[in-house]
C-alpha cells in the first residue's frame, strides 16, 4: 500500500490558509501556490540518491555530496498543475517537464486525456506528478495510468489538498505511488468538490471562471 504524507510544517499551513481564503486575489494565489510547491518539493525529494565528489574549497580539498544524477521529471496535470511546477523547478532546475492534459466529464466524473507530451526517456526517470487537488482521484489515476503505459515506474504524486475519497481511490488504483499532500480535507460534496477545499484551483490561478 502506498504511503500518504501529510505536511504539517507551519510555513506550509500558514500559506495554505491564504490559498484557501476566497478573498485572496489571483496574483497572490499564484505566488502562494508556487511557494508551497517549493516547500513541499523539499520533502518529496528528501531521499534522492547522493554520490561523493571531490572538490576544492578556498582552504583545502574535500569529499562532498551531490545528487547522483538520477534523472527527474516533473509532470503537471493541465492546467492547474502548472501552478506548482515552477516551485519544484526552483529546487531541481535540471529536471525535465512533461505535461498531461485531462478534463473531468461533468456527467460521468471520469477523466478524459486530451494531451500528453513527455520526455522520451520517461521510463528512466523519477517522476513527480503535480496537481493542486486530489478530489475524486480520477484525474490523478488516469495521469499515472498514462505514465505507466509509457514505461514509468518510479512515480510520486504531490498536491495541496486531498479528499479522503480521492486518496482511497488512488491507493486502490496505484498502491506503488506515494501521495504527498499539504492537507487532508473532510470530504467531497454532492458536486464532487473538496470540502472545505479552496475552490477551483485552475480558475483561481489563471483568473478564469
Curated annotation (Swiss-Prot):
It comes from Staphylococcus haemolyticus (strain JCSC1435). One of its GO terms (molecular function) is magnesium ion binding. Pathway: Pyrimidine metabolism; UMP biosynthesis via salvage pathway; UMP from uracil: step 1/1. Catalyzes the conversion of uracil and 5-phospho-alpha-D-ribose 1-diphosphate (PRPP) to UMP and diphosphate. It catalyses: UMP + diphosphate = 5-phospho-alpha-D-ribose 1-diphosphate + uracil. Signal peptide: none annotated. Allosterically activated by GTP. It holds the Pfam family UPRTase. This is Uracil phosphoribosyltransferase. Belongs to the UPRTase family.
